[in-house]
Regions:
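Short, hydrophobic/glycine-enriched beta-strand segments
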Residues: 26-33
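Short catalytic helix/loop segments, enriched in acidic residues and glycine
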Residues: 43-60
Length: 336
């Protein structure tokens, strides 16, 4: 039987293969989050996780819409004013309207970003140009609303609806962090497939290796995707790719839960339960139950599952992205 050490080495190879299969992995980011002094007050909002940890695995493409629109640093603070659907970017003290300058910059910058094939984007929370949600918008009479989005972020999401986006503040939540980074790597794999050509056979293989990951997010939509694969002959390749890609990313955006992870782990257990001894099966069921009751993080049952996958040479399970959706060095599943 294969030792735990051999199992660990194989896991390292799988972790490396995630990177080689998806490189280059480019992510957009608000420039201030990298420590550049581009904020209105001349300061920055450097994020250590993004720069020191995730930065080892991605190539950052930094953008500061306000600076690139020619507004300078430091500059007068600005806010969004008017109709929440079509707000204007206005300086707080002098009331100067910079909307047109930012819109021109946005149009030009989005055209540049399209050619860079981004796999995700991290925006600055609350920014009138970069906030994704709950950005403050004021009526003409000064009444405050928090239902807005930054002008640049909103335009980016409209033009690139499949690209995973998140705000740096929300990435402090371990579950949201793991979900975002998982989606980034999945989207990169999807981009690779699209670029190589989406044949029916290639799409079926892509779906197969992502099946358990999809089950952890939304079992019903995983079934819908499976039916789409089964009816691939009814669709033109381009239409099939578009429909699958949209639903694939929509499914992954649904938050995985402990209950759904337990369901997936039990599916995996069922794959080789007849080959497990009584004590081995009891041990695996025990760690799954501990995870279910919040006594251990997800990494604990997964580690034991991976060990048995290697021992029994379960190639179908080994190929599942669910086991290694992102580099283990990020330790994302140590906290969920």
């Amino acid at each position: 039987m294969e030792s735990l050490r051999d199992s660990h080495l194989c896991e390292q190879e799988q972790s490396r293969s995630i990177m080689t299969a998806t490189a280059p992995l480019r992510l957009g980011i608000s420039r201030c989050l990298l420590g550049e002094e581009v904020r209105f007050d001349g300061g920055h909002k450097r994020d250590n996780f993004l720069t020191e940890v995730l930065g080892r695995y991605v190539e950052w493409v930094s953008v500061c819409p306000e600076v690139e629109a020619g507004l300078g640093t430091p500059r007068e603070a600005m806010r969004l004013v008017g109709d929440p659907q079509y707000p204007r970017l206005v300086t707080i003290r002098t009331g100067i309207d910079h909307t047109r300058a930012l819109e021109t910059m946005t149009t030009n910058r989005l055209a540049e970003l399209k050619s860079l094939d981004l796999s995700g984007y991290v925006f600055k929370k609350g920014s009138p140009s970069c906030g994704i949600e709950r950005v403050r918008i004021f009526s003409e009479q000064g009444k405050l609303s928090r239902n807005g989005a930054g002008l640049f972020a909103r335009a980016f999401i409209e033009q690139f609806p499949l690209i995973p986006v998140e705000e740096e503040g929300r990435l402090c939540d371990p579950t949201l962090r793991e979900n975002f980074i998982e989606r980034v790597f999945c989207y990169r794999r999807w981009q690779d497939l699209v670029q190589s050509g989406v044949t029916k056979q290639a799409l079926a293989q892509f779906h197969t290796i992502h099946k358990y990951l999809l089950l952890a997010h939304h079992p019903q939509q995983c079934e819908v995707l499976g039916r789409l694969i089964g009816q691939a002959h009814l669709h033109r390749p381009k239409e099939l790719a578009q429909r699958y890609g949209e639903l694939f990313m929509k499914t992954l955006a649904v938050k995985a839960t402990v209950r759904k992870h337990v369901n997936v782990l039990q599916h995996i257990l069922g794959y080789f339960k007849k080959r497990l001894g009584i004590h081995e099966k009891a041990e695996l069921l025990g760690v799954i139950d501990d995870y279910h009751h919040g006594l251990t993080p997800l990494i604990v049952p997964l580690t034991l599952v991976k060990h048995y996958v290697q021992i029994f040479d379960a190639s179908y399970i080994r190929a599942q992205v669910y086991l290694n959706p992102h580099p283990k060095e990020l330790m994302l599943r140590n906290h969920v």
